[in-house]
Each structure stands twice: as C-alpha cells, then as structure tokens.
Regions:
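Soluble or luminal CAZymes and related metallo-dependent hydrolases
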Residues: 23-27, 88-92, 185-186
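Catalytic core and acceptor-binding pocket of nucleotide-sugar-dependent glycosyltransferases
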Residues: 168-193
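Short His-Asn-centered micro-motif
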Residues: 7-12, 45-47, 91, 111-113, ...
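GT-A fold catalytic core of metal-dependent nucleotide-sugar glycosyltransferases
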Residues: 88-134
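A short, conserved acidic/glycine-rich loop-to-beta-strand motif
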Residues: 129-153
Length: 193
C-alpha cells in the first residue's frame, strides 16, 4: 500500500469575473466528485458558498499566514487577469503549504477547480522522483526558444505535484522574485505583450 497523497483544491468565489454574478460554479462539484472516485483524500480550501461540496472542506481564510501576507504586500499584477484572479493563482500555494504543514503531509497534488482527475495520485510512481512536477508543453523546451527570449517558456500548475519542501522553496522563490527582482518582472511584462 502506498502513502496517501492528498488532492488539494482551492476555490474562493471572491470578486472573480468568471463568476458572472453567481456565488459558485457548478463545475467545482464535478471536480471534487471526480477526484474522490480515484483518491482517498480530497481537500477543498474554500469559502462559505462551497462548504457543502466536499467532505474535507476547510475555510481558506483559516490558512492565511505571515508568509502569504509578506507575498501579498510585494505582489504586482503583471497579467491581463483581474488582480483578484491573479492573486488567487499564487494564494493557493501559500494556503496549501500551511495546510500541509499543520496536518503533517509530506506531499500533495494541486488541481485547478475545473480539472477532472482520472488518476489515483497516491499510486502514480513518477511523483516519487521529484520535488515539483507540473505540465509544461514539450514544444516549449528552452533549446527551442528564440535566443534571448527565455521568458516565453511557461508551465501550468493546474495539475501539479509538490513535496512540502518543494512548496516551501517555491513560495520563497515567489516572494523573492516580487520583492527583489523587479528588473526580471519588467522584462516578463514586456515579453508578454
């Protein structure tokens, strides 16, 4: 029997533009139900509007930490997304790290709230060989990029694996990038246009 790896979902309605005036989207129910078909532990860090949708629901605000507050203070939205949405992309990593540390988990899989999971992540052997795994399209290999334009490379964390240590290092990296490397972030914005 393998060690249980929790599947983590973060979904707060907040001011998200895609909510179209609704408090929650129906797809979240399907995301949770599908993940539970294959996985023993599925956790939702959510808000009062989705409390009934997952047996292992936790109020996301209970996992706000000093580390998140530090990141939030230096965060600058460089995307075309509304700021609340862009912050949420990063916020989940900080909240999930706190959940893992409080509950003594050594690893997790994080999925977006609109992902349908057809895998028992606890039995997926390739995760045993890394600290972090995320979807990166093959045709975006660094060697295939235009010279001097490495910022076009991107990775999607909509289905990602982290050890707790890997998530600590990633959130430290996020704080450092926004606090101390404005030059790189300015180049990101220029390349992204």
């Amino acid at each position: 029997m393998s060690k249980i790896i929790p599947v983590m979902v973060h979904h707060e309605t907040g001011e998200k533009a895609q909510a179209a005036g609704k408090k929650n989207q129906e797809y979240l129910k399907y995301c949770i139900a599908q993940a539970k078909k294959y996985n023993e532990k599925v956790v939702l860090l959510g808000d009062e509007y989705n409390k009934a949708w997952c047996d292992d629901w936790h109020n996301a605000n209970d996992f706000i930490t000093e580390k998140w507050t530090k990141f939030h203070a230096v965060f600058e939205n460089l995307s075309t997304y509304p700021t609340a949405w862009a912050e949420g992309i990063f916020k989940r990593f900080f909240l999930i790290l706190e959940y893992l540390e409080r509950n003594s988990f050594e690893e997790c899989v994080i999925i977006d709230s609109d992902v349908l999971l057809y895998l028992n992540v606890s039995e997926y052997e390739p995760f045993r060989h890394c600290k972090v795994a995320a979807e990166t399209p093959l045709l975006q290999d660094f060697a295939m990029l235009e010279k001097g334009n490495g910022l076009k490379w991107k990775t999607c964390a909509g289905f990602s694996y982290f050890t707790t240590q890997g998530l600590r290092e990633f959130t430290d990296f996020c704080i450092d990038m926004y606090a101390n490397h404005k030059d790189v972030r300015s180049e990101e914005r220029r390349v992204g246009k």
